[in-house]
Amino acid sequence: VVKFAKQWFADGHTAGKFIEGAQSSKSSADLCRTPLLLTLLCISYEYSRSIPSDRAELYESCVDALLFRWDVFRSIERSNLSKELSHARKKLLLSRVARRYFDEGVFFFRKNDLTRVLAEELSDLEVKFVTAESVLFELEAHHGLFIERADKLYSFSHLSFHEFFTALSYVGENKVIDLAILAIDDPKYREVFLMGLEKMYDPNEVAMIIFRYVKDEFIKPGQYDPYVDRLVQDISASGAPLHRDMRERFAELMVDMQVLQITLSEEDSEIDDG
């Protein structure tokens, strides 16, 4: 990352600030693992002079770079398809496709199935003058959002993009409460839920549902779950615009979980000693 940034940015001060920001969070560090995504972070940083601290804004910045800034950077003229399918509608299309596959637990898609799903979603969006095949080609070749992993076997180019677009779908349909319930029961939805929470204008109602559920189902009956503990910590540390009193509730909840874990560990030790 350090070597790449120093080669990318002519100004050493700018390179230093970028490196500091890129290494400041796990989300940005994950994106720095591949040259393409590291390039996108650099392009995004050139526009905004900052690296977003919350995961949803970070991935949105990279998606925007892929959908628009990447072509500008490479001096690629917008195709006829791009004129028919706007930046916003591409995002909507990708969010619907991502959620369909994610909810089914499918992360790798056969080309014929992917084009079928794209065609169905294009029809629902009333996009009439482009084909699913041309959309797939553009999303793969021009934008790098899909990648062919093996012969006619595709996936999103980064799992985080699949999760991000799935989160966009839940937020767009105002179903983040449903997403919260899924996240409590199924770890695969954890990142999706956290990004959805960060994308909400007011996530406090959803956060309160999680708070009460954890209190009633885990703290009061004395049931410790390490996954739920981690989820509580992630919500507390997230970039979601939570009210101060809600953050205080989650800080209290984290203490409750720690006390519960210690208490149960001590009880187990006493049983073993006995």
Range-by-range predicted roles:
Residues L38-L41, F165-T166, G196:
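Buried hydrophobic packing segments
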